Amino acid sequence: METDLYRFLPGTDMKAMNEIGKTPRYLNNPQWDTRQYTFSFIPLKEIYWHGYQKDQKTMFLSGHKSHLYILSGVCLLLFLTGLLNFINLYLIAMLHRGKEYGLKKVYGANKGHLFIQIWMENSLLTASALSVAWLIIEVTQVPVNRLLNTTFSYTPFDGWLSIGVLLLLPLLTSVYPFFKYSFSSPIQSIRSIGWGNHSVRSRMIFLGIQYALTFLITICALYFNKQLDLMLNTDPGFRTKNIMHVRHIYESQDFNLLTEEKWEQDRAIARAIRNKIKTCPYAEYTESVWDEITQPAYAVTFTTPDGNKALLNWRRVSPSFFKLFDIEMEEGILPENDEKVHYIMNRTAMKALQLNTLEDASVIEDDKFRKNKNVAFYPIVAIAKDHYSGHLSMGAEATIYEIDEFGSTSTYIAYQEEKLPELLDYLKGVMQEFYGTETVEYTFLEDKVKAIYDEDRKIATIYNVFALIAIIVSCLGLFGISLFDIRQRYREIAIRKVNGAGMKDLYQLLFKKYLLVLGISFVVATPLAYYLIHQYTADFVVKAPIGIGIFVIALVLVAIISMGTLYWQIRKAANINPATVMKSE
C-alpha cells in the first residue's frame, strides 16, 4: 500500500476529505487500466495503530490496540488485587489502633489531629512502597528489556503517575479509618479492637474477591501459553525446514530513475545471478519470488462467468514453488512451464468464488473483464491445499497462483542440512563474481515463521509474570489475615486440645474456612475467565480448545501455594501448649 505525507492548512475538514476518498476512482487512463482506487488520510499521531504497515517496510512504528487492551486489562486486574490486599491488611492493622485512637480522644484529640496522624502514616507507607517499586524497576530494567526484546524509556507520564499515587492513595486509604474513629465515641473505639463476626466476614469477602482476580489472571495466562504452543507447533501447510531466503539483487528498483540502458543492464545481471543460483549443485529446489510466502501477496479482484467476485492474493510462481514448499494438489495436476497461462487456486479461494468443482472453475481478472466483456476466461487447472501465510489465527488466505517463470530480487532455496556450508560458499562465490563482495544477505524460513508470533510470546510472558505477581500478592494478603485470625483463636484451640481434639481435627478446623474461600473464588472466576477467553478468540480461525485442564491446573497451582503459606502458621497453632496460652490470655 502506497503511503504519502501531506501537510494541510489549519481548519481543513479532514472528515470531508476522507468521505471524498471513499469513492473509487481511476488512477490511470481507464482505456487500458480499469482498476479503481480509494484513499484515506490518517493523522500522523494515529498511524501507529494502523496495522497495514506490518505488510511493508516503512519508516513508522506500528502496534495493535488489542495488545494494549490485553495489557491494560491485566494491569487493572493486578492493581485491584493489590488494592484489595492493601485494604484488607490495613483494616486488620486498624483493629489494633482502635484503643489508641479512643484514648487520644479521651485526652482531647480532635478530628483534625486524628486525620493528620492517619494521613501521615499512610503517606509514609505509600512513599516507602513507591520507593521500593522504583528500585525494583531500576534493578529489573535490563532483564525485562531482554525478556521482552524491547527497550522501555521513562516518560513524563511516569512522573505524574508517581505523584498521583503519592498524593491520592494516602487520601483514599485514610477516609475509612478517619470516619470510623472520628465519629465514634471513645468507648466504641476502644472496644473495636475485637475480632467480631462482621469483621471476619468482610475480610473474607475481600480475600475472596482478591483470589477470584488471581484465578482469572492465572487461567488466562495458562490459556495464552496453550494458544501460543498450538501456533508454534501447528504445521503451516508448507515446508519450513532447510529453506533459505536469499536476497541477491541490490540495484535500485525505482524505475523512474533508471534509463533504458541501465534497466536492460540490471535485468541482464539479475538473469545471470538467478541462473547461477538455479544451477547450484547444493540446492534441491530454487524459486525466485517477489512476495515472500510469509507475507500477503498483491491483492487482485477476480470474477467468474457467473458473476461471482472475490479479492484474492495473486502470486506469480513457477511449478518449482509447489515442489520447494511441499504444497500438494488436492485436485488436478501441476502444470509445467509453457507459453500458456495456467491458474491454480487454493481451496479457500474456491470457496470465496463459490466454485465447487474443478471442471466448472474458470476466472478472469475483474479489471480485464470490465475492459472487455467478451474476454476469454482462464480455466483453473488444479486446486492446491491451503497453507497459512501469516498468523495462524487469521486462517488461510484466498490465493490464486499464476504459473509463470518470474524473475525477482530474491530467491528461496531448499537444501539438505548437511550441505549448508557448501551452499553458503557457493552463494559467496556468486556475490563475489557480480558485486565484488562475499557478503550474502539471507534468512531461514523457520526463523521468519517463528517471528510471526513474537508479539504473542511477549503477551504470554507478561501474562505469566503478572499471574505470578498476583499469586504472590494474594498469598501475602492471606498470610496477613491468617496470622491475625489464627492468633485470635489461640484460646479456642487450647480449649479444644484440652477437650481431646487431635492434630487432624485442628488442621480441618483451621484450613476449612480458607479452603471454602478458595473454592468460592474459583467458582466465581471460572465462568468469567471462560467468557473473556471465548470473546477474545471469537475471530480466531485456529484456536486452542479451552478445555478443563487450564482450570484444574490454575486451581491446583494457586491452592498449593496458598495452603503452603498457611501451613506453618496452622502447624504452629496446632502445637501450642494449652497451659501457656491460658496463662497469657
What are these regions (language model features)?
Residues M1-L61, A268, R274-P281, R347-K351, ...:
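"Rare, low-scoring activations can occur
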Residues S62-K99, A127, S202-Q227, R457-R491, ...:
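Hydrophobic alpha-helical transmembrane segments of multi-pass inner-membrane transport and secretion
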Residues T3-L9, N18-T23, Q36, S40-H50, ...:
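Membrane-proximal extracellular/periplasmic loop immediately following the first transmembrane helix
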Residues R25-C75, H96, T140-L161, W195-I205, ...:
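Membrane-helix entry/capping segments
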Residues S40, N88, N122-P186, K226, ...:
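Small-residue-rich transmembrane alpha-helices
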Residues L84-L125, F183-I193, L476-L516, N575-S584:
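Intracellular coupling helices
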Residues M1, N256, E261, I269-D360, ...:
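Short beta-strand boundary microenvironments
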Residues T140-L148, L213-N242, Y536-V541:
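Alpha-helical transmembrane segments
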